[in-house]
Amino acid sequence: MTLDISKYPHLALANTPDELRLLPVESLPEVCDELRTYLLNSVSQSSGHFASGLGAVELTVALHHVYNTPFDHLIWDVGHQAYPHKILTGRRDQMSTIRQKDGIHPFPWRGESEYDVLSVGHSSTSISAGLGMAIAANKEGLGRKVVSVIGDGAITAGMAFEAMNHAGDVHSDMLVILNDNEMSISENVGALNNHLARLLSGSLYTTIREGGKKVLAGAPPIKELVKRAEEHIKGMVVPGTMFEELGFNYIGPVDGHDVTELVKTLKNMRNLKGPQFLHIMTKKGKGYAPAEADPINYHAVPKFDLSQNPLPKAANAKPTFSKIFGDWLCDMAAEDEKLMAITPAMREGSGMVRFSKEYPSQYFDVAIAEQHAVTLASGMAIGGYNPIVAIYSTFLQRGYDQLIHDVAIMELPVMFAIDRGGLVGADGQTHQGAFDLSFMRCIPNIVIMAPSDENECRQMLYTGHKHQGPSAVRYPRGNGLGAEIQKEMTALEIGKGIIRRQGEKIAILNFGTMLEYALEAAEKLNATVADMRFVKPLDEELILELAANHDVLVTVEENAIAGGAGSGVIEFMMKSKCLKPVLNIGLPDRFVEQGTQQELHTALEIDAAGIEKKIRDYIA
């Protein structure tokens, strides 16, 4: 989207932070208005993360106006709110390509811009990384400043508090900004706190505060009394006592949509010593009424018409695997009052909205706390209940030790419903579910299932729920294949696959929803196709049978080849001294970039044509 100067006269003067810093503070409200309008028009035409960026416009402008980026390090947690940052850092005309194949990255990305000092995508990493950069900057001695911006959801994660606890201990110079969009600010409270922020971050207060510390250093009881008095006074008007206890100087909350006041406060705080904490209040979706009213559904959007509401929906779309899971969850809860469902802040994405409303006493959203989610399930299982952890593949990585230490070692009946297994598409490297089969397969005591369609997914969920030990059902993002759903639920025989097509010479061992591709390729090759169903335990009897009756075995999976299901097949064959050629088809040994799922399947040659080509090349 090329900038029309007549519509954006102020924004046209700020294509980079250097240009923005040349503008007078008085013009920044107009810059913000135009930036918000540009963001609205751009994302509505390209798709992408929407509501978060709209709420961070004034903060972004103020930060780049006050701080000398990229010399000063500005870190965005997760990165959903970083679209305005991308627009102001030389990528304005490329915004129409965001999240698209070969386009600009959906999150801050080091390889894309010198202004993106940390590649992100998962939450709650900004304070730890910022503290590391602050320590390095202190040793460097060049006066480099470090700012970490984190949201009210991300700051609930344990990693964020671990970082703040350490920051208070080492006392490095850094600023943490909490972008709190949980509520709107009333005019009076906003004005009062803006005034307090200027007062508490100003040089007079800071000088008195630091001078008092030195004077009272020799009288610890009095020093402690004064410290408590200061915290008490702050606590009467601002909710910052907890952050003060962690060693931060807390300022706020202030109006995050008053760019002039933000600039004043940030200028005051820029040269303060030690860890600083600025709490700002913003409105997610600011400037677009439908997004303000429904920020969850407007978190990420398809292409849409700004003049129309609600967002467009695909006509007659097949149900998603997430919906299949959500419907199964409700059906199962009707039979099992001991079923407990846990999600780490992924209610909508995991298809759990209906369940949360129909079975609220059995539903637990633990916020962004994957480690806690897994061990919470462990405790529930010990207590005699039947917990299910609904989690994205990419986020299960964050609870890996708990999966091993708190579930698998004790062989507890916890089932993991792993959504977004395989390639998720537009969110790129940080979100592809490429590794779960590999990192789970090496864990003893766990049953791992990979359904080939939505009905098999439903039956596997039932199988895992009834299994008296750890289990995982791994399914992809997006719509199902149109398979007929059997209402009746039947437990599958653990570790048994089935033949889906009988051929000769070549046997394709399929794991998961690549089955459709495998069958299409098999028609061209006259190959046998087995739906293996179980990654662990493998159907060893079926593998030996296929090896005995075919010249070549081919494994197909939407997971990293390294350590994946295909690796398991080869390991078993070597152990059994079954010396037959085996071709592994799956994801390559690299982080897979963004694009639609279909684009990536084609590019990586794991669609039907790619599978056929790889097999023909192998047997040539």
UniProtKB/Swiss-Prot annotation:
- Gene name in the database record: dxs
Keywords, sorted A to Z: Isoprene biosynthesis, Magnesium, Metal-binding, Thiamine biosynthesis, Thiamine pyrophosphate, Transferase
Q: In which pathway does it act?
A: Metabolic intermediate biosynthesis; 1-deoxy-D-xylulose 5-phosphate biosynthesis; 1-deoxy-D-xylulose 5-phosphate from D-glyceraldehyde 3-phosphate and pyruvate: step 1/1
Q: Where does Mg(2+) bind?
A: 152, 181
Can you list the disulfide-bonded cysteine pairs?
none
Cross-referenced NCBIfam families: dxs, PRK05444.2-2
Record note on quaternary structure: Homodimer.
Cofactor requirements of the protein? Mg(2+); thiamine diphosphate
Residues involved in thiamine diphosphate binding: 80, 121-123, 153-154, 181, 288, 370
Q: Which GO terms describe its biological process?
A: 1-deoxy-D-xylulose 5-phosphate biosynthetic process; isopentenyl diphosphate biosynthetic process, methylerythritol 4-phosphate pathway; terpenoid biosynthetic process; thiamine biosynthetic process
On cofactor binding, the record's note says: Binds 1 Mg(2+) ion per subunit.
Query: What InterPro entries does the record point to?
Result: Dxylulose-5-P_synthase, THDP-binding, Transketo_C/PFOR_II, Transketolase-like_Pyr-bd, Transketolase_BS, Transketolase_C, Transketolase_CS
Give the family, as the similarity comment puts it: Belongs to the transketolase family. DXPS subfamily.
The protein's annotated catalytic reaction(s) are:
D-glyceraldehyde 3-phosphate + pyruvate + H(+) = 1-deoxy-D-xylulose 5-phosphate + CO2
- Provide the Gene Ontology terms for cellular component: cytosol
Q: What's the protein called, per UniProt? A: 1-deoxy-D-xylulose-5-phosphate synthase
